[in-house]
Amino acid sequence: IYGVLRVSFDLLPAVQWWWGGVLLALGLATAAFGVVYAAVQSDMKRLLAYSSIENIGILYAGIGLTIVFSAFELGALAALALAATLYHALNHACFKSLLFLVTGSVLHATRERSLGRLGGLMRSMPWVAWLGLVGTLAIAGLPPLNGFVSEWLLLQSFLFTPTIPQTFANMLIPVGAAVLALVAALAAYVMVKFYGVIFLGQP
């Protein structure tokens, strides 16, 4: 992420909208790929790993949107998109670390990674369950936690985009808003399944 930002804003001779469009499209495709694969995982660590791919895609989409706005001299929207992207990077580092600690605790206690063989751990591991609930709600993007704030700010960056004097960019940004909303909804489903099966389901 840092390298892409430095190359895009410091090493390239000028900010190019097409480069932002490429990053935006690749980021959205990566996010969709990650969340779809996370939804079908039965291994809890693989599920979190694909969720990380989804969130990295969101970060690249945010960087791409920032570059597009900068290329068309939309300074306020570029600042909003960049702030949302960096905040989401910080958020992801926090709640994903927490969730990997939770899965590590579950694995250490049960010697089991398969979601189909876990369940009902709220009774035997209440502290881990409550910490896992915080991480799950944050990564699912539910208010008022940090994951909601960063994803909402990024979605606002898409929604408040004015008409841009470039046809492809004008088409890509509304599609990007729809894909981001769909990815966020699927991510919420994935994380509710993750938490519900491990801590609330029948063993």
Where are these regions (language model features)?
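Hydrophobic transmembrane alpha-helices and their helix-loop junctions in integral membrane proteins
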Residues: 1-203
